[in-house]
Amino acid sequence: MGYLKKLALFISVIILGIFIIGCDSSSDTAEKAKEDSKEEQIKKSFAKTLDMYPIKNLEDLYDKEGYRDGEFKKGDKGTWTLLTSFSKSNKPGEIDDEGMVLYLNRNTKKATGYYFVNKIYDDISKNQNEKKYRVELKNNKIILLDNVEDEKLKQKIENFKFFSQYADFKDLKNYQDGSITTNENVPRYEAEYKLNNSDTNVKKLRDIYPITTKKAPILKLHIDGDIKGSSVGYKKIEYKFSKVKDQETTLRDYLNFGPSDEDS
């Protein structure tokens, strides 16, 4: 009888040990799943805006509201900020950066901004050379407000299209095995994906911009701020075609919703 009690106790200890190990293993698996889900959290955070792409008529944004928090004043409907820029090194030690910024105020239903032409030098003794040309959006068309004598530049500005107007991210959920970087203290999150040249958005970018490298780009999804949403932080997309010195080639896109500027 004493033997049976000891055997029962021994078996109970073994079962308890297996249970504890199983719990630890389940805990590790759950923790790993939580770790792995950060990529999904980043994609879901971006999907809130990327699901709207392509936004063929930018004025549709007047009727769309983004993430709101305590930073908004009572009655403020918010402002959408768009930016698309293309930067490329055409000469050693120099990077040419061109693009457009547009502010769509949902209170006034007015959209104003500027086209910029920027030259960045490696040599810090040289002044960064940036020119801005004021624009507004009317009837989904870019109207140039400043006098531009260069006809080629004038046409480029008036025919400018934001990446958000032609990009399509319906397959975003299928992007897998991204390189994930997180810093919860800042907070900051990044997911990088190696694309191929058959990607729909990549082909469109190659049609529009003078991308000379044949290398397929890396897509970077970058979040500054709360991954669940924040009007203080921002999100941006980057297509890095080349990071090689004096061959740098990058497309940047930014679409964010935030409080309106009192002066706008």
From Swiss-Prot:
Pfam families: DUF576
Entry-linked Gene3D superfamilies: 2.50.20.40
Subcellular localization(s) per the UniProt record: Cell membrane
Principal place of residence: membrane
Residues with lipid group (N-palmitoyl cysteine): 23
Keyword Nucleus applies: no
Assigned GO CC terms: plasma membrane
UniProt keyword terms in alphabetical order: Cell membrane, Lipoprotein, Membrane, Palmitate, Signal
Family affiliation: Belongs to the staphylococcal tandem lipoprotein family.
Covalent lipid adducts (S-diacylglycerol cysteine), residues: 23
Source organism of the structure: Staphylococcus aureus (strain N315)
Protein's name according to its UniProt entry: Uncharacterized lipoprotein SA0397
Cysteines paired by S-S bonds: none
InterPro entries referenced in this protein's UniProt entry, alphabetically: Csa, Csa_sf
Signal peptide: 1-22
Membrane topology label: Lipid-anchor
